C-alpha cells in the first residue's frame, strides 16, 4: 500500500505490532476490488450466508464511493490484507425505523459496512482485533455507538457480532440487488464504558 500523510494507522490492540488498520488510498482501489472478488469466490457458503455477488453487492461504485469519502479501511498483517470494512461516521435513514437502546442523532453514530475477512485469515480471531481498533477509531471521532446490519441468513456474522458485544435491536424486510426481498437484522454496540488501549 502507498504511504501518505492521510494514512490513518492504529497499532493492533492485542499487542501484535505487525497488525494494523489503515485508510485505503485512491490508488489502492484495484487492490481492494480484487480482494473483495477473492473473498466472494473463496469463502465457504458465501451463497448461503452473506450472499454477496460482486457487481450487485458490493459494487465498483460502492467501493469507489467509500474510498473517495475516506471511509474504506484495511486491516493489515504486515503487507497482506487480512480484512476490509467501510466505516461511516453517521447512520443512514434506513436505520431510523429501528428502536435503538439510545436515541442518538445520525452523526453521533458510526456504521459498519461490507466488513469481511480474507479467506486465509478466517477463523483466526482477526475480526475481534479489527473491531477493537474500529472502536478506538470511532471513539476518537466522538461517536456514542456503532451500528450495523446483517442478512438474517448470515448466521456466522450474527454469532460473531453477539460474541463481540453487539446487541440485536430489530429487523426490516428490504430489497437488495443481490438477494431480492429479505430480512436485515440490526445490531448496536453502545460505546459508553468501553475502554480500549487507545482510549
Locate predicted features.
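Hydrophobic adenine-recognition pocket in adenosine-nucleotide-binding enzymes
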Residues: 115-117, 150
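Conserved GNAT-fold acetyl-CoA-binding loop/helix
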Residues: 41-62
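Conserved acyl-donor/pantetheine-binding loop and adjacent beta-alpha core of acyl/acetyltransferases
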Residues: 85-114, 122, 175-178
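Conserved beta-hairpin
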Residues: 70-87
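Conserved GNAT acetyl-CoA-binding A-motif
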Residues: 131, 138-150
Amino acid at each position: 500500500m502507498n504511504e501518505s500523510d492521510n494514512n490513518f494507522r492504529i497499532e493492533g490492540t492485542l499487542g501484535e505490532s505487525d497488525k494494523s488498520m489503515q485508510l485505503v488510498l485512491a490508488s489502492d482501489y484495484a487492490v481492494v476490488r480484487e480482494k473483495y472478488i477473492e473473498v466472494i469466490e473463496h469463502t465457504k457458503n458465501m451463497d448461503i450466508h452473506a450472499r454477496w455477488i460482486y457487481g450487485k453487492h458490493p459494487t465498483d461504485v460502492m467501493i469507489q464511493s467509500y474510498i473517495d469519502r475516506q471511509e474504506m479501511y484495511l486491516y493489515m498483517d504486515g503487507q497482506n490484507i487480512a480484512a476490509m470494512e467501510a466505516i461511516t461516521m453517521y447512520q443512514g435513514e434506513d436505520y431510523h425505523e429501528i428502536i435503538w437502546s439510545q436515541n442518538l442523532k445520525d452523526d453521533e453514530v458510526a456504521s459498519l459496512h461490507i466488513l469481511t475477512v480474507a479467506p486465509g485469515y478466517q477463523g483466526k480471531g482477526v475480526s475481534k482485533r479489527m473491531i477493537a481498533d474500529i472502536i478506538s477509531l470511532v471513539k476518537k471521532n466522538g461517536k456514542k455507538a456503532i451500528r450495523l446490519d446483517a442478512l438474517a441468513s448470515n448466521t456466522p456474522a450474527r454469532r460473531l457480532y453477539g460474541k463481540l458485544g453487539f446487541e440485536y435491536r430489530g429487523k426490516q424486510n428490504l430489497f437488495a440487488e443481490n438477494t431480492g426481498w429479505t430480512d436485515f437484522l440490526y445490531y448496536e454496540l453502545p460505546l459508553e464504558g468501553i475502554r480500549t488501549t487507545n482510549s
